[in-house]
Amino acid sequence: MKFNRMTLIASPTPKAQKAAEELKKLYQWYPLEEADVIIALGGDGFMLQTLHHLLDNSFNLPVFGMNLGTVGFLMNEWRPSNLLRRLIRAKQFTVYPLRMDGQTVSGEQKIYRAINEVSMLRETRQTAHLEISVDGRIVLPELVSDGVLVATPAGSTAYNLSADGPILPFDSGMLALTPISPFRPRRWRGAIVPDGSIIDMRVVDPDKRPMSAVADQRELREIANVTITLDRTTPLHLLFDPNHALDDRIAREQFRLC
């Protein structure tokens, strides 16, 4: 695909800023409001910040990231040369964020979105007690654990994988429901549910066992209940080099030993 107006954003790290200065000398750049594609320099955390900025400001631009961070799962290899050619050959992936509708013990209501995962986490040394429902049916009357998370395929290789959750193929149409350090039920290690599911979580005894809900980096404390769905009204578009596309990375990640 061909793009005519690139805009450049970079992480504040010295490495990313140096790379940005190099690119500014090589190509013509436009303000975000006039651009048709975003070039993002940084790591996965910066990419998440960029995508959330697009969500919050209703921008619908594809993003081509180049890794100047650590892992760079959502990024392409950093190479300053042939950028326009890479954009023409790039493979586009559309990802949909999770929508978290949360209500606190005091009645405050918030809506947050997450590209990777929504996590429910205990706030104190007390283990969390949660009731979990899927599509209006109680599937776990009481989960005793440090918490639980719901991950998208794009986020299944992040916190979800660290919690021993499954890696989801990009086109699986599924979400991972993964407990964090579960105690009871002893044999429950999580579930995979269709991405059209409505997942409800209710905190049992929130006064004694308070919990927070976290949508990527956004936290809502003293949570009473949350509803999690996939928001298909706000698509996000990521661009990848053909030989390093997101679905290939997710597939390869399943066979990594370290």
From Swiss-Prot:
Function: Involved in the regulation of the intracellular balance of NAD and NADP, and is a key enzyme in the biosynthesis of NADP. Catalyzes specifically the phosphorylation on 2'-hydroxyl of the adenosine moiety of NAD to yield NADP.
Main subcellular location of this protein, as a coarse class: cytoplasm
Domain of life (superkingdom): Bacteria
Coiled-coil regions, chain positions: none
NCBIfam families given in the database record: PRK04761.1
Reaction equation(s) it catalyzes: NAD(+) + ATP = ADP + NADP(+) + H(+)
Gene name for this UniProt entry: nadK
Cofactor: a divalent metal cation
Compartments in which it is found: Cytoplasm
Enzyme active site: D44 (proton acceptor)
Alphabetical list of InterPro entries matching this protein: ATP-NAD_kinase_N (IPR017438), ATP-NAD_kinase_PpnK-typ_C (IPR017437), NAD/diacylglycerol_kinase_sf (IPR016064), NADK (IPR002504)
A Pfam cross-reference name: NAD_kinase_C
UniProt family annotation: Belongs to the NAD kinase family.
Any one GO MF annotation of this record: ATP binding
Organism placement in taxonomy: Bacteria, Pseudomonadati, Pseudomonadota, Alphaproteobacteria, Sphingomonadales
A GO-annotated cellular component: cytoplasm
Species annotation: Zymomonas mobilis subsp. mobilis (strain ATCC 31821 / ZM4 / CP4)
Entry protein name: NAD kinase
Assigned EC number: 2.7.1.23
GO biological process, one term: NAD metabolic process
Binding locations of NAD(+): D44, G45, N116, E117, D146, A154, T157, A158, Y159, N160, L161, S162
